[in-house]
Amino acid sequence: MSVADNDSFEYAGACGGYLDRYGYPFCRGRVFDTVEKDKGQYDEAAEVLWTTGACMMIRSKDYWAVNGLDGRFFAHNEEIDMCWRLRMMGRKLYCLPQSKVFHVGGGTLPKGNPMKTYLNFRNNLTMLYKNLPQKELHYVMRVRWLLDYVAAWQTLILNRNVGDFCAIYRARRDFMRWRTEFRPERKEHQRERVEARVPRTLRTNFCLVWQYYARRRKTFAELP
């Protein structure tokens, strides 16, 4: 829950997180920038793909079995990356709405800071590279190449935000430069995974960008 508005879910993880086909995170209670009020609509416990790092309970042995949070990420997407690795080794994650935590969003980097944009794009691409099944990797990365540049130019032309425009370009450039550093880990993850792919209930088959911007589906309940 948000400290600023106690009746609203918090952006970072709301009531449990999922991914779309192309790696865009969304939550019960938050889709992109649309954050819902808590009206009891998500009061049931649910299996999720990821939980926010702001409020997560995990067995120590499981944390260290996947080498914990990846410190190279610094911030943003690092908990999603770890949760995905946990899922590949056969663990399941649940959101339990009976517990309630109030979180101050943007404490590390405030919204509007180009570094926040940079880390979100770079780390999200890195997370995909580390964890996607081999048969999906090249297709998803090609689509993301297109979507990322559409996002960059939309930011520049419609929002006149030069800082975020440059941040997205730098994020893609730096991802291409440092992805080889993660190649050994990727091979290890693929070799040791006990689940061939994440269920479509947790990593969906739809494109969240299309659903949100073209179909105007702004809340979790409205998604396919």
What is the predicted function of each stretch?
Residues 183-224:
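Long, low-complexity C-terminal extensions of enzymes
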Residues 43-100:
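A short, conserved alpha-helix in the catalytic core of glycosyltransferases
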Residues 1-25:
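Conserved donor NDP-sugar-binding/catalytic core segment of glycosyltransferases
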Residues 1-2, 28, 96, 104:
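Short glycine/serine/threonine-enriched helix-capping/active-site loop
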